[in-house]
Amino acid sequence: MIANDLKLDSSKIQLYYDQKYLRPIPYRCTLLTARMRDRQIIFMKYVGDLEDRKKNAGTKMTTEIDPSKRFLGEGEKPTNEMKMVGKNYGPRAVTVGFFEHKEKLKPNIDFQEESSCYAFRVSKEAIKRFQILSLQNGFEKHRVIFLFGRINKITGKITAHCGCEPIQTSYADHFEIDESFDIEKVCTLASFLGMELVGMAISHKPEEKFPMSEYMIRLAAKYQNKYGEYFTTLIVTPANDNDVSVEAFQVSDAAMKLEKGNYFAESKDPHVVEFKEELTVCQFKRKSADVNLFLCAVRVRQTNSKIPLHDFPSPGQEPSLLDLKQYLIDHESCPSWYTFFDFNFLVFIFLNDLISEDELYTITQEIKSKQEIAPSIYNKLNNLCNQL
Protein backbone atom coordinates (compact mmCIF):
# COMPACT_ATOMS: atom_id res chain seq x y z
CA MET A 1 0.00 0.00 0.00
CA ILE A 2 2.88 2.37 0.85
CA ALA A 3 4.60 1.66 -2.47
CA ASN A 4 1.41 2.30 -4.46
CA ASP A 5 0.70 5.53 -2.62
CA LEU A 6 4.24 6.83 -3.22
CA LYS A 7 4.41 5.45 -6.78
CA LEU A 8 7.51 3.35 -5.99
CA ASP A 9 8.66 -0.18 -6.82
CA SER A 10 7.81 -2.26 -3.72
CA SER A 11 10.75 -4.62 -4.34
CA LYS A 12 13.15 -1.70 -3.83
CA ILE A 13 11.72 -0.53 -0.51
CA GLN A 14 13.37 -1.53 2.79
CA LEU A 15 11.76 -0.79 6.16
CA TYR A 16 13.80 -0.20 9.32
CA TYR A 17 13.14 -0.09 13.05
CA ASP A 18 15.57 2.79 13.58
CA GLN A 19 16.19 6.18 12.02
CA LYS A 20 19.87 5.31 11.32
CA TYR A 21 18.82 2.40 9.06
CA LEU A 22 20.80 -0.19 11.06
CA ARG A 23 17.98 -2.59 12.04
CA PRO A 24 16.05 -3.71 8.94
CA ILE A 25 12.61 -5.27 9.22
CA PRO A 26 12.61 -8.68 7.46
CA TYR A 27 10.81 -8.91 4.12
CA ARG A 28 7.44 -10.72 3.97
CA CYS A 29 6.73 -10.41 7.67
CA THR A 30 3.50 -9.40 9.40
CA LEU A 31 2.89 -6.86 12.14
CA LEU A 32 2.91 -9.76 14.62
CA THR A 33 6.13 -11.46 13.45
CA ALA A 34 7.86 -8.11 13.10
CA ARG A 35 7.04 -7.48 16.78
CA MET A 36 6.00 -3.88 16.24
CA ARG A 37 4.08 -2.00 18.89
CA ASP A 38 0.84 -0.17 18.14
CA ARG A 39 1.57 3.22 16.59
CA GLN A 40 5.28 2.46 16.42
CA ILE A 41 7.29 4.66 14.08
CA ILE A 42 9.06 2.76 11.28
CA PHE A 43 11.50 4.15 8.73
CA MET A 44 11.63 3.52 5.01
CA LYS A 45 14.60 3.54 2.67
CA TYR A 46 14.28 3.39 -1.11
CA VAL A 47 17.20 1.53 -2.73
CA GLY A 48 16.08 1.93 -6.34
CA ASP A 49 16.81 4.56 -8.96
CA LEU A 50 14.76 7.71 -8.46
CA GLU A 51 14.67 8.09 -12.26
CA ASP A 52 12.13 5.23 -12.21
CA ARG A 53 9.80 7.31 -10.11
CA LYS A 54 10.19 10.24 -12.45
CA LYS A 55 8.99 8.08 -15.33
CA ASN A 56 6.12 6.58 -13.32
CA ALA A 57 4.94 9.89 -11.95
CA GLY A 58 5.36 11.70 -15.27
CA THR A 59 6.61 14.80 -13.44
CA LYS A 60 9.83 16.22 -12.09
CA MET A 61 11.12 14.64 -8.87
CA THR A 62 10.57 17.19 -6.13
CA THR A 63 10.96 17.18 -2.39
CA GLU A 64 7.55 17.08 -0.74
CA ILE A 65 7.59 19.52 2.13
CA ASP A 66 4.42 18.26 3.81
CA PRO A 67 3.54 14.67 2.80
CA SER A 68 0.65 14.62 5.27
CA LYS A 69 -1.43 16.53 2.69
CA ARG A 70 -1.73 13.31 0.67
CA PHE A 71 -3.54 11.71 3.59
CA LEU A 72 -6.07 14.50 4.18
CA GLY A 73 -9.48 15.17 2.74
CA GLU A 74 -10.36 18.29 0.76
CA GLY A 75 -9.99 21.32 3.02
CA GLU A 76 -8.92 19.16 5.98
CA LYS A 77 -6.11 20.30 8.29
CA PRO A 78 -3.36 17.99 9.65
CA THR A 79 -4.29 16.10 12.81
CA ASN A 80 -2.40 16.53 16.08
CA GLU A 81 -0.68 13.18 15.46
CA MET A 82 0.53 14.33 12.05
CA LYS A 83 1.86 17.56 13.53
CA MET A 84 3.65 15.65 16.31
CA VAL A 85 5.27 13.20 13.87
CA GLY A 86 6.48 16.05 11.69
CA LYS A 87 7.88 17.90 14.69
CA ASN A 88 9.68 14.88 16.19
CA TYR A 89 10.85 13.04 13.07
CA GLY A 90 11.04 15.62 10.33
CA PRO A 91 8.64 17.01 7.69
CA ARG A 92 8.84 13.91 5.47
CA ALA A 93 7.98 11.34 8.15
CA VAL A 94 4.72 9.36 7.91
CA THR A 95 3.26 6.67 10.16
CA VAL A 96 0.75 3.86 9.83
CA GLY A 97 -1.70 6.27 11.43
CA PHE A 98 -1.49 8.47 8.35
CA PHE A 99 -2.66 5.59 6.16
CA GLU A 100 -5.38 4.64 8.67
CA HIS A 101 -6.64 8.22 8.60
CA LYS A 102 -6.77 8.18 4.81
CA GLU A 103 -8.66 4.87 4.89
CA LYS A 104 -11.29 6.33 7.23
CA LEU A 105 -12.00 9.09 4.72
CA LYS A 106 -13.24 6.53 2.20
CA PRO A 107 -17.00 5.89 1.96
CA ASN A 108 -18.37 3.29 4.38
CA ILE A 109 -21.37 1.71 2.66
CA ASP A 110 -24.26 0.49 4.78
CA PHE A 111 -28.03 0.91 5.09
CA GLN A 112 -29.14 4.48 5.82
CA GLU A 113 -32.64 5.00 7.16
CA GLU A 114 -32.89 8.79 7.30
CA SER A 115 -32.39 11.38 4.58
CA SER A 116 -32.31 15.17 4.40
CA CYS A 117 -35.69 15.31 2.64
CA TYR A 118 -38.45 14.32 5.06
CA ALA A 119 -41.33 14.62 2.59
CA PHE A 120 -41.71 15.62 -1.06
CA ARG A 121 -44.87 17.29 -2.35
CA VAL A 122 -45.14 17.48 -6.11
CA SER A 123 -47.84 19.51 -7.84
CA LYS A 124 -50.14 17.64 -10.20
CA GLU A 125 -49.53 20.27 -12.86
CA ALA A 126 -45.73 19.94 -12.68
CA ILE A 127 -45.64 16.35 -13.95
CA LYS A 128 -49.06 15.96 -15.59
CA ARG A 129 -47.83 16.32 -19.18
CA PHE A 130 -44.76 14.20 -18.36
CA GLN A 131 -47.03 11.42 -17.08
CA ILE A 132 -49.34 11.61 -20.11
CA LEU A 133 -46.45 11.37 -22.58
CA SER A 134 -44.97 8.44 -20.64
CA LEU A 135 -48.31 6.61 -20.75
CA GLN A 136 -48.69 7.33 -24.46
CA ASN A 137 -45.22 5.91 -25.13
CA GLY A 138 -45.92 2.87 -22.98
CA PHE A 139 -42.89 3.65 -20.79
CA GLU A 140 -40.78 2.01 -23.49
CA LYS A 141 -37.93 4.48 -22.95
CA HIS A 142 -36.45 6.30 -19.98
CA ARG A 143 -37.27 10.00 -19.72
CA VAL A 144 -36.43 12.73 -17.21
CA ILE A 145 -37.94 16.02 -16.10
CA PHE A 146 -36.38 18.53 -13.69
CA LEU A 147 -38.52 19.82 -10.82
CA PHE A 148 -38.38 23.32 -9.36
CA GLY A 149 -39.88 24.54 -6.13
CA ARG A 150 -39.11 25.50 -2.56
CA ILE A 151 -37.39 23.81 0.39
CA ASN A 152 -38.24 24.19 4.06
CA LYS A 153 -34.86 23.37 5.58
CA ILE A 154 -36.29 23.38 9.11
CA THR A 155 -38.85 20.63 8.47
CA GLY A 156 -37.07 18.98 5.54
CA LYS A 157 -40.22 19.27 3.41
CA ILE A 158 -40.00 20.10 -0.30
CA THR A 159 -42.71 21.37 -2.65
CA ALA A 160 -42.23 21.18 -6.43
CA HIS A 161 -44.39 23.74 -8.25
CA CYS A 162 -43.28 23.19 -11.85
CA GLY A 163 -41.28 20.93 -14.12
CA CYS A 164 -39.02 21.45 -17.11
CA GLU A 165 -38.29 18.52 -19.39
CA PRO A 166 -34.86 19.00 -21.03
CA ILE A 167 -33.87 18.19 -24.58
CA GLN A 168 -32.86 14.56 -24.32
CA THR A 169 -32.33 11.30 -26.17
CA SER A 170 -34.26 8.43 -24.63
CA TYR A 171 -33.27 4.77 -24.70
CA ALA A 172 -34.75 1.58 -23.31
CA ASP A 173 -32.37 1.56 -20.34
CA HIS A 174 -31.23 5.17 -19.91
CA PHE A 175 -31.47 8.75 -21.18
CA GLU A 176 -28.91 11.34 -22.26
CA ILE A 177 -29.49 15.05 -21.74
CA ASP A 178 -28.49 17.16 -24.73
CA GLU A 179 -25.46 19.37 -24.11
CA SER A 180 -27.32 22.33 -25.62
CA PHE A 181 -29.75 22.37 -22.69
CA ASP A 182 -28.51 25.00 -20.21
CA ILE A 183 -29.83 23.90 -16.82
CA GLU A 184 -27.97 26.72 -15.06
CA LYS A 185 -29.97 29.36 -16.95
CA VAL A 186 -33.18 27.60 -15.95
CA CYS A 187 -31.97 27.64 -12.33
CA THR A 188 -31.37 31.39 -12.66
CA LEU A 189 -34.96 31.85 -13.81
CA ALA A 190 -36.23 29.73 -10.91
CA SER A 191 -34.24 31.82 -8.41
CA PHE A 192 -35.90 35.01 -9.72
CA LEU A 193 -39.24 33.40 -8.80
CA GLY A 194 -38.02 32.37 -5.35
CA MET A 195 -37.51 28.73 -6.30
CA GLU A 196 -34.62 26.33 -6.89
CA LEU A 197 -33.92 22.96 -8.48
CA VAL A 198 -35.33 20.47 -5.96
CA GLY A 199 -35.29 17.19 -7.86
CA MET A 200 -36.00 15.22 -10.97
CA ALA A 201 -38.55 12.63 -12.05
CA ILE A 202 -37.54 9.62 -14.15
CA SER A 203 -40.10 7.48 -15.97
CA HIS A 204 -39.38 3.87 -16.88
CA LYS A 205 -40.94 0.44 -16.86
CA PRO A 206 -41.23 -1.03 -13.36
CA GLU A 207 -38.76 -3.67 -12.29
CA GLU A 208 -39.63 -5.75 -9.25
CA LYS A 209 -37.45 -4.93 -6.22
CA PHE A 210 -35.30 -2.42 -8.14
CA PRO A 211 -36.92 1.06 -8.40
CA MET A 212 -33.62 2.69 -9.47
CA SER A 213 -30.86 1.29 -11.64
CA GLU A 214 -27.11 1.73 -11.21
CA TYR A 215 -26.84 4.70 -13.58
CA MET A 216 -29.72 6.45 -11.77
CA ILE A 217 -27.85 6.08 -8.47
CA ARG A 218 -24.77 7.71 -9.96
CA LEU A 219 -26.80 10.50 -11.55
CA ALA A 220 -28.77 11.21 -8.36
CA ALA A 221 -25.52 11.32 -6.35
CA LYS A 222 -24.07 13.79 -8.85
CA TYR A 223 -27.06 16.12 -8.59
CA GLN A 224 -27.29 15.84 -4.78
CA ASN A 225 -23.65 16.90 -4.56
CA LYS A 226 -24.11 19.72 -7.06
CA TYR A 227 -27.52 21.13 -6.11
CA GLY A 228 -27.70 20.28 -2.42
CA GLU A 229 -28.55 17.51 -0.01
CA TYR A 230 -32.32 17.99 -0.46
CA PHE A 231 -32.33 17.07 -4.16
CA THR A 232 -34.81 14.19 -4.54
CA THR A 233 -35.45 11.71 -7.34
CA LEU A 234 -39.01 10.68 -8.22
CA ILE A 235 -39.56 7.38 -10.02
CA VAL A 236 -42.65 7.30 -12.26
CA THR A 237 -43.85 3.87 -13.39
CA PRO A 238 -47.15 2.63 -14.86
CA ALA A 239 -49.76 1.50 -12.32
CA ASN A 240 -52.17 0.41 -15.06
CA ASP A 241 -53.12 1.48 -18.60
CA ASN A 242 -54.44 4.85 -17.42
CA ASP A 243 -52.53 5.74 -14.27
CA VAL A 244 -49.02 5.93 -12.87
CA SER A 245 -47.25 5.20 -9.61
CA VAL A 246 -44.84 7.75 -8.11
CA GLU A 247 -42.11 6.91 -5.58
CA ALA A 248 -39.49 9.26 -4.14
CA PHE A 249 -35.91 8.51 -3.11
CA GLN A 250 -32.69 10.16 -2.09
CA VAL A 251 -29.37 8.37 -2.39
CA SER A 252 -27.34 7.83 0.78
CA ASP A 253 -24.46 9.94 2.05
CA ALA A 254 -22.14 7.09 1.02
CA ALA A 255 -23.32 7.38 -2.60
CA MET A 256 -22.59 11.11 -2.54
CA LYS A 257 -19.08 10.42 -1.19
CA LEU A 258 -18.54 7.80 -3.90
CA GLU A 259 -19.45 10.32 -6.59
CA LYS A 260 -17.45 13.15 -5.07
CA GLY A 261 -14.38 10.94 -4.59
CA ASN A 262 -14.68 9.43 -8.09
CA TYR A 263 -15.01 5.88 -6.74
CA PHE A 264 -17.76 4.79 -9.15
CA ALA A 265 -16.75 2.35 -11.88
CA GLU A 266 -18.75 1.34 -14.94
CA SER A 267 -21.10 -1.55 -14.24
CA LYS A 268 -22.55 -4.07 -16.69
CA ASP A 269 -25.29 -5.05 -14.23
CA PRO A 270 -28.00 -2.36 -13.70
CA HIS A 271 -28.68 -3.81 -10.24
CA VAL A 272 -25.08 -3.56 -9.00
CA VAL A 273 -22.90 -0.52 -8.27
CA GLU A 274 -19.22 -1.17 -9.02
CA PHE A 275 -16.25 0.57 -7.33
CA LYS A 276 -12.76 1.32 -8.62
CA GLU A 277 -11.25 -0.20 -5.47
CA GLU A 278 -12.30 -2.31 -2.51
CA LEU A 279 -14.45 -0.43 0.02
CA THR A 280 -16.18 -1.39 3.25
CA VAL A 281 -19.68 -2.66 2.46
CA CYS A 282 -21.67 -3.75 5.53
CA GLN A 283 -18.35 -4.35 7.37
CA PHE A 284 -16.86 -6.43 4.54
CA LYS A 285 -14.39 -5.39 1.85
CA ARG A 286 -16.13 -5.43 -1.52
CA LYS A 287 -15.75 -3.93 -5.00
CA SER A 288 -19.50 -3.77 -5.61
CA ALA A 289 -22.83 -3.42 -3.84
CA ASP A 290 -26.55 -3.88 -4.51
CA VAL A 291 -28.21 -0.69 -5.81
CA ASN A 292 -30.87 -0.77 -3.09
CA LEU A 293 -28.18 -0.33 -0.44
CA PHE A 294 -27.86 3.30 -1.56
CA LEU A 295 -31.57 4.24 -1.48
CA CYS A 296 -33.42 6.21 1.20
CA ALA A 297 -37.20 6.22 0.72
CA VAL A 298 -38.95 9.60 0.97
CA ARG A 299 -42.64 10.29 1.64
CA VAL A 300 -44.35 11.68 -1.45
CA ARG A 301 -47.78 13.13 -2.14
CA GLN A 302 -49.48 15.42 -4.63
CA THR A 303 -50.39 19.05 -4.09
CA ASN A 304 -51.48 22.06 -6.15
CA SER A 305 -49.03 24.39 -7.86
CA LYS A 306 -48.68 28.06 -6.98
CA ILE A 307 -48.00 28.73 -10.66
CA PRO A 308 -51.28 29.26 -12.58
CA LEU A 309 -50.27 28.21 -16.12
CA HIS A 310 -48.58 25.04 -17.38
CA ASP A 311 -49.59 25.27 -21.05
CA PHE A 312 -46.35 26.04 -22.88
CA PRO A 313 -44.29 23.04 -24.09
CA SER A 314 -41.07 22.09 -22.31
CA PRO A 315 -37.72 22.34 -24.16
CA GLY A 316 -37.84 18.56 -24.59
CA GLN A 317 -40.83 19.00 -26.90
CA GLU A 318 -38.78 21.41 -29.01
CA PRO A 319 -41.20 24.37 -29.18
CA SER A 320 -40.74 27.00 -31.89
CA LEU A 321 -41.77 30.60 -32.55
CA LEU A 322 -45.02 29.21 -33.94
CA ASP A 323 -45.78 27.79 -30.50
CA LEU A 324 -44.96 31.17 -28.99
CA LYS A 325 -47.32 32.91 -31.42
CA GLN A 326 -50.16 30.49 -30.70
CA TYR A 327 -49.61 30.77 -26.95
CA LEU A 328 -49.86 34.57 -27.05
CA ILE A 329 -53.02 34.35 -29.17
CA ASP A 330 -54.60 31.84 -26.77
CA HIS A 331 -53.92 34.10 -23.79
CA GLU A 332 -54.42 37.55 -25.33
CA SER A 333 -57.49 38.21 -23.16
CA CYS A 334 -55.54 37.57 -19.94
CA PRO A 335 -53.58 40.15 -17.94
CA SER A 336 -50.04 40.25 -19.27
CA TRP A 337 -48.46 39.20 -15.95
CA TYR A 338 -50.76 36.15 -15.93
CA THR A 339 -49.85 35.26 -19.53
CA PHE A 340 -46.16 35.33 -18.64
CA PHE A 341 -46.66 33.27 -15.48
CA ASP A 342 -45.92 29.95 -17.19
CA PHE A 343 -42.52 28.55 -16.23
CA ASN A 344 -41.80 26.85 -19.56
CA PHE A 345 -42.91 29.97 -21.45
CA LEU A 346 -40.28 31.95 -19.54
CA VAL A 347 -37.74 29.16 -20.14
CA PHE A 348 -38.37 29.37 -23.89
CA ILE A 349 -37.97 33.12 -24.28
CA PHE A 350 -34.89 33.14 -22.01
CA LEU A 351 -33.03 30.12 -23.40
CA ASN A 352 -33.64 31.33 -26.95
CA ASP A 353 -32.26 34.79 -26.09
CA LEU A 354 -35.51 36.56 -26.93
CA ILE A 355 -35.04 38.53 -23.71
CA SER A 356 -31.96 39.38 -21.64
CA GLU A 357 -31.33 38.28 -18.06
CA ASP A 358 -32.08 41.81 -16.83
CA GLU A 359 -35.39 41.81 -18.71
CA LEU A 360 -36.19 38.38 -17.27
CA TYR A 361 -35.60 39.66 -13.75
CA THR A 362 -37.90 42.62 -14.39
CA ILE A 363 -40.60 40.30 -15.76
CA THR A 364 -40.45 37.99 -12.73
CA GLN A 365 -40.75 40.91 -10.32
CA GLU A 366 -43.78 42.21 -12.24
CA ILE A 367 -45.31 38.72 -12.15
CA LYS A 368 -44.83 38.44 -8.38
CA SER A 369 -46.42 41.84 -7.80
CA LYS A 370 -49.14 41.15 -10.43
CA GLN A 371 -48.22 44.22 -12.45
CA GLU A 372 -48.58 44.57 -16.20
CA ILE A 373 -45.51 43.47 -18.14
CA ALA A 374 -43.53 46.35 -19.67
CA PRO A 375 -45.02 47.12 -23.14
CA SER A 376 -41.54 47.13 -24.70
CA ILE A 377 -41.05 43.44 -23.85
CA TYR A 378 -44.55 42.44 -24.88
CA ASN A 379 -44.21 44.32 -28.19
CA LYS A 380 -40.81 42.73 -28.88
CA LEU A 381 -42.32 39.24 -28.68
CA ASN A 382 -45.37 40.21 -30.73
CA ASN A 383 -43.18 41.71 -33.45
CA LEU A 384 -41.20 38.46 -33.67
CA CYS A 385 -44.41 36.49 -34.04
CA ASN A 386 -45.86 38.85 -36.63
CA GLN A 387 -42.86 38.17 -38.89
CA LEU A 388 -43.88 34.51 -39.25
Protein language model regions, located:
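Eukaryote-biased feature marking scaffold/signaling PDZ-domain proteins and nuclear chromatin regulators
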Residues: 8-10, 26, 31, 37-39, ...
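Active-site-proximal, Lys/Arg-enriched surface segment
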Residues: 112-137
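Short beta-strand scaffold segments in enzyme catalytic cores
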Residues: 144-150, 232-235
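N-terminal, Lys/Arg-enriched amphipathic/low-complexity engagement segments
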Residues: 149-173
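C-terminal functional modules of predominantly eukaryotic multidomain proteins
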Residues: 1-110, 114, 180, 216-221, ...
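Short HxH-centered metal-ligating active-site micro-motif
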Residues: 165-218
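Amphipathic alpha-helical interaction motifs in eukaryotic regulatory proteins
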Residues: 2-3, 37, 131, 187, ...
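Short, flexible beta-strand-to-coil junctions
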Residues: 150-155, 204-206, 236-242
